[in-house]
């Protein structure tokens, strides 16, 4: 299995201020391309804006604003094809946490399936949580006893707020969602089906021009480009783990023409769908 490849190992002493600090924030504004790696510690990753390809335990995720990941020390991940990507990594060492809280539930570990550790945040949740993350960013750079406790208390607040505001990437649209959140949810639900932006805006009485502009500002991509990237990431997953024909994979990912799908896939990843699948057949 290709999963035997571990990549770089990021060491605790390179990221934590002292051996007393349980929590740190690694700001990535922007997040550059970063090779396959794993850590001595766990992390909560929150994406604020821009876009990129997050390869997490060999599964591709096209990430943008609102994506949130609970990454464990045993996971391997990397960042590729980034464009104005901004995120924060909230790093924590479980055995240093001292507050009496249900940390295992609030900050799920690698014992849970990966699908249960990827969530999305809407605008309200992002705004609320970012205020706490900014405070933690300042507090975690101190090592006195009071600051250590405050840092851990801020981590607890962030974990609680994340649990309150998060929703599954494929959940139905929320009734009180902002326009941008509703659009993101609709796109995630349209990987296999056609999506008509103008009809979506008309249905919800949105201004197509302003929503299109705001989407580009926040994600760094146009609406069609983002949807195509979602579909290509799904195609990578299907090619890796399932045995459907290339034509079936294309159809499941919203491409009516399998030849066109192959061209687009090759343009995006530099390899044909069949050659990409063969990589994993060769190492099983």
Swiss-Prot record:
Activates expression of the rhaSR operon in response to L-rhamnose. The record marks 248 as: Interaction with sigma-70. The keyword Membrane does not apply. GO terms for molecular function: DNA-binding transcription factor activity; sequence-specific DNA binding. Residues 198-219, 246-269 bind DNA. Its main location: cytoplasm. It is found in: Cytoplasm. InterPro entries: AraC-bd (IPR003313), AraC_XylS_family_regulators (IPR050204), Homeodomain-like_sf (IPR009057), HTH_AraC (IPR018060), RhaR_RhaS-like_N (IPR047220), RmlC-like_jellyroll (IPR014710), RmlC_Cupin_sf (IPR011051), Tscrpt_act_RhaR (IPR023699). Residues 181-279 form the HTH araC/xylS-type domain. Binds DNA as a dimer. Keywords: Activator, Cytoplasm, DNA-binding, Repeat, Rhamnose metabolism, Transcription, Transcription regulation. GO terms for biological process: positive regulation of DNA-templated transcription; rhamnose metabolic process. Pfam families: AraC_binding, HTH_18. It comes from the Bacteria. GO terms for cellular component: cytoplasm. This is HTH-type transcriptional activator RhaR.
């Amino acid at each position: 299995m290709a999963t035997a490849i571990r990549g770089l190992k990021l060491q605790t002493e390179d990221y934590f201020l002292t051996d007393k600090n349980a929590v740190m924030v690694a700001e990535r504004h922007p997040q550059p391309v970063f090779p396959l790696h794993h850590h001595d510690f766990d992390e909560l990753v929150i994406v604020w804006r821009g876009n990129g390809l997050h390869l997490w335990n060999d599964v591709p995720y096209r990430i943008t604003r609102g994506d949130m990941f609970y990454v464990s020390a045993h996971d391997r991940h990397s960042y590729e094809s980034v464009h104005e990507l901004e995120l924060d990594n909230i790093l924590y060492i479980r055995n240093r946490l001292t507050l009496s809280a249900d940390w295992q539930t609030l900050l799920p570990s690698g014992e849970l399936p990966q699908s249960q550790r990827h969530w999305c945040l809407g605008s309200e949740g992002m705004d609320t949580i970012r205020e706490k993350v900014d405070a933690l960013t300042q507090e975690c750079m101190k090592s006195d006893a009071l600051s250590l406790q405050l840092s851990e208390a801020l981590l607890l607040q962030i974990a609680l707020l994340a649990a309150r505001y998060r929703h599954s990437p494929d959940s139905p649209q929320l009734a009180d969602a902002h326009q941008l959140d509703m659009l993101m949810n609709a796109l995630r639900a349209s990987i296999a089906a056609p999506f008509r932006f103008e009809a979506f805006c008309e249905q919800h009485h949105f201004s197509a021009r302003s929503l299109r502009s705001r989407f580009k500002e926040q994600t760094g991509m146009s609406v069609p480009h983002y949807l195509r990237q979602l579909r290509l990431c799904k195609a990578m997953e299907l090619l890796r783990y399932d045995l459907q024909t290339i034509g079936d994979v294309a159809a499941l990912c919203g491409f009516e023409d399998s030849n066109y799908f192959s061209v687009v896939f090759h343009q995006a990843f530099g390899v044909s769908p069949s050659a990409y699948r063969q990589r994993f057949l060769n190492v099983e």
